[in-house]
Amino acid sequence: MIELRGKAVADAHKAILQEKVAAVGDSVITMAVLLVGEDHGAHMYATFMEKTAKNFGYGFVLKQLPETATQDEVVAALKELNDDAAVHGILPLMPMPKHIDTEALIDMLDPKKDIDGLTTYNIGLVTAGKGGFAPCTAKACMAILKHYDIPVEGKHVVVIGRSQVIGKPVALMTLAAHGTVTMCHSRTPDLAEQVKRGDIV
């Protein structure tokens, strides 16, 4: 069994990203984060994203709304980011307050700015194997396999979890790479047995 560590892969990708940002020159690439409410994890992630932007030299915009923000107010904030030509990528942070219809909100996101592959449009492209933006964690899983020179073709891949941002896209991407995929989740019986059968877990 080979345990796959992500740090070496992350370090290599950081160097590549720094080169790409530097190559843009005077043009500023800007990422926007839409943060609604008081979720501690979402606030911590927004802080992390801002620090990352500073470290790499790209622009960062934080659009923050209170817990009491209405659906219309959140939609208006997203539309403003969609329409802003200076913003190149948008990441709506989850979870949002329970009264916000996040599914409806996400599909109002400009697919060209949907950097975490959340929209139905990008999910469809990934599902069809026609590109599109895939969620970053799913892309990271594929990058780790590539870094360690582990072929997916012909392998039995066991994916644990079925979330929209990790499990499902990882399953689709490994399937597109000609793996044989088994998806497991909280209601899968004999999970340990499924894991034993996998070439890649």
Can you say where each PLM-predicted feature lies in the sequence?
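Positively charged, low-complexity intrinsically disordered leader regions
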Residues: 1-27
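Helix-enriched interaction subdomains in cytosolic or periplasmic regions
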Residues: 1-9, 84, 100-107
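N-terminal glycine-rich anion-binding loops that anchor highly charged ligand groups
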Residues: 22-31, 37-55
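Short beta-strand segments
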Residues: 35, 91-95, 160
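Glycine-rich phosphate/diphosphate-binding loop of Rossmann-like nucleotide-binding domains
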Residues: 36-50, 135-201
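Short beta-strand elements in bilobed, periplasmic/extracellular small-molecule ligand-binding domains
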Residues: 53-68, 181-183
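Short, well-structured alpha-helical segments in soluble
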Residues: 73-85
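Anion-binding alpha/beta catalytic cores of soluble intermediary-metabolism enzymes, centered on
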Residues: 89-152, 170, 191-194
